[in-house]
């Protein structure tokens, strides 16, 4: 999936595979835009594909990148992932290393529906 990334500006290719509770896998890649604010990250692309297909509960997301060491998702992606549960497992894989977290550890004070009045 990483190879499908559209990143003519940053050249930073990212792919993501999101596993739903039922074992289904949803894929995403980053898609950049000349208007940088319209760029979508691979993690969010995978979440949006899953939600569009009807999935709402997820086990884990695996992110593929060329970075060493591989980094965690950006803040925006952390917030979107946290929307679907604090126990979500996040794994970031680079060419020779990988790292794992729980989304609750990456975003301990996530904004959630319980804060909406």
Would you name each region that the model predicts?
Residues 1-4, 53-117:
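C-terminal binding/interaction regions
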Residues 29-44:
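Compact, glycine-rich, soluble single-domain proteins
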């Amino acid at each position: 999936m990483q190879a499908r990334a559209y990143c003519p500006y940053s050249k930073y290719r990212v792919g993501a595979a999101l596993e739903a509770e039922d074992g289904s896998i949803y894929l995403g890649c980053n898609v950049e835009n000349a208007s940088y604010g319209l760029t979508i990250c691979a993690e969010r692309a995978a979440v949006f594909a899953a939600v569009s297909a009807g999935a709402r509960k997820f086990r884990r997301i695996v992110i593929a990148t060329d970075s060493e060491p591989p980094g965690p998702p950006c803040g925006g992606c952390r917030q979107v992932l946290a929307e679907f549960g604090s126990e979500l497992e996040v794994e970031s894989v680079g060419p020779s290393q990988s790292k794992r977290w729980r989304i609750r550890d990456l975003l301990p004070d996530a904004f959630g529906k319980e804060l909406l009045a």
